[in-house]
């Protein structure tokens, strides 16, 4: 079930529902992918799930399957990076629902550091970490915090418009950095990469938003 971390929020009902004062509510369940290889830099790396990550994903899939009437998920949306795809596929297979991949819900593009061993990244790019970047400062051949925020916020706005007419719920499989931005948008808070964000667990429902 949704754990203590879960953020519950109302994003906004479709216009026709607001005009007629009809209570049309569907939910978006947002999860971070299962555990992947922590010995390399993540971002746009195409690392696979670890054995534990697969186990975590199967556990969530079982929970969603056993409580289908409660969750009522008819479609999964996912980042197209491998660790998210694997997580989404495990759940989709269990629930027998389709997946749509959205590349704009990828983690931050960390350019040259993507998939690089941690020790090598520290050697080549000492002390280069997400929270230390300035707003307009890029990862080498990658994104700046400003660009990452713009990409995700635009994708989220488009996503909400696309699903707002659904009468069943959807699941979004994405990444920690993306979830941090989405929660700021939902809560109406200013986003900064320098914020100390709460650690988001793997393969558990992190956000439950009503539309």
Roles of regions detected by a PLM:
Residues 2-14:
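Extreme N-terminal basic, low-complexity initiation segments
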Residues 187-211:
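Domain-level recognition of soluble alpha/beta enzyme cores
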Residues 15-25:
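Short, Lys/Arg-enriched N-terminal segments with co-localized hydrophobic residues
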Residues 176-180, 204:
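GST superfamily/GST-like fold recognition
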Residues 28, 32-98:
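Active-site-proximal alpha-helix that buttresses catalytic centers in soluble enzyme cores
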Residues 28, 74, 165-176:
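Generic beta-sheet signal
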Residues 67-72, 159-168:
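Glycine-rich phosphate-binding loop signature in dinucleotide/nucleotide-binding domains
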Residues 48, 94-154:
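Phosphate-handling substructures
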């Amino acid at each position: 079930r949704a754990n203590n971390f879960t953020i519950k929020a109302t994003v906004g009902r479709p216009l026709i529902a607001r005009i007629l004062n009809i209570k049309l509510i569907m939910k978006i369940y947002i999860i971070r992918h299962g555990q992947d290889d922590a010995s390399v830099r993540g971002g746009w790396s195409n690392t696979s799930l670890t054995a534990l990550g697969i186990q975590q994903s199967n556990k969530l899939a079982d929970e969603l399957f056993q409580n289908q009437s409660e969750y009522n998920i008819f479609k999964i949306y996912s980042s197209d990076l491998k660790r998210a795809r694997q997580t989404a596929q495990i759940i989709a297979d269990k629930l027998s629902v389709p997946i749509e991949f959205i590349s704009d819900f990828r983690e931050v593009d960390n350019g040259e550091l993507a998939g690089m061993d941690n020790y090598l990244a520290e050697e080549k790019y000492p002390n280069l970490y997400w929270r230390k970047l300035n707003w307009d400062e890029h990862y080498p051949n990658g994104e700046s915090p400003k660009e990452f925020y713009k990409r995700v916020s635009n994708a989220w706005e488009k996503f909400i418009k696309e699903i707002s007419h659904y009468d069943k719920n959807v699941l979004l499989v994405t990444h920690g950095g993306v979830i941090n931005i989405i929660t700021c948008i939902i809560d109406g808070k200013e986003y900064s990469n320098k914020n100390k964000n709460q650690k988001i667990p793997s393969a558990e429902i992190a956000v439950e938003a009503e539309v």
